[in-house]
């Protein structure tokens, strides 16, 4: 992964982590009894975003890949359940509506991150550059 791509992913996950953390802290501390499932999902998503940001920053590629895969599954499951069983989601989470309240960034970001992370792992090592042979 190139430096600019890495910095952009770290920044995106850090900002989303801060936003989700702020939202979930308010939800959990003020009205957890009203909608425990959505608010706990918000808290889990916040922790996941922070973990992914740290993993990208520290170069923990496998942790970042697993984290973004879990994120994508979470967005798809919560987004689908929000439409199929709206009674489970009396209030919004970061992932409700496939992240529509956040401009669908929660849906697009893990796809982009997985493409970048998985493509970066398939590059040939520098010492494998083919040299002309005699």
Task: For the regions a language model picked out, list residue spans one by one.
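Transmembrane alpha-helix entry/boundary detector in multi-pass membrane proteins
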Residues: 5-9, 25-45
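C-terminal TM-helix exit segments that contain a strictly Trp-centered aromatic cap at the helix terminus
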Residues: 20-27, 70-86
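Loop-to-transmembrane helix junctions at the membrane interface
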Residues: 55-75
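Alpha-helical transmembrane segments in multipass membrane proteins, preferentially the mid-helix core
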Residues: 48-58, 113-116
């Amino acid at each position: 992964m190139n430096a600019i791509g890495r910095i952009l992913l770290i920044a995106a996950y850090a900002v989303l982590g801060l936003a989700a953390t702020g939202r979930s802290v308010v939800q959990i501390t003020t009205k957890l009894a009203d909608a425990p499932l959505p608010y706990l999902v918000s808290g889990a998503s916040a922790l996941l975003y922070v973990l992914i940001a740290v993993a990208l920053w520290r170069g923990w590629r496998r942790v970042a890949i697993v984290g973004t895969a879990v994120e994508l599954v979470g967005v798809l499951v919560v987004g689908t359940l929000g439409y199929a069983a709206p009674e489970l989601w009396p209030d919004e989470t970061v992932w409700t509506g496939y992240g529509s309240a956040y401009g669908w960034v929660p849906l697009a970001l893990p796809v982009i991150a997985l493409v970048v992370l998985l493509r970066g792992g398939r590059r040939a090592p520098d010492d494998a550059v083919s040299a002309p042979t005699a």
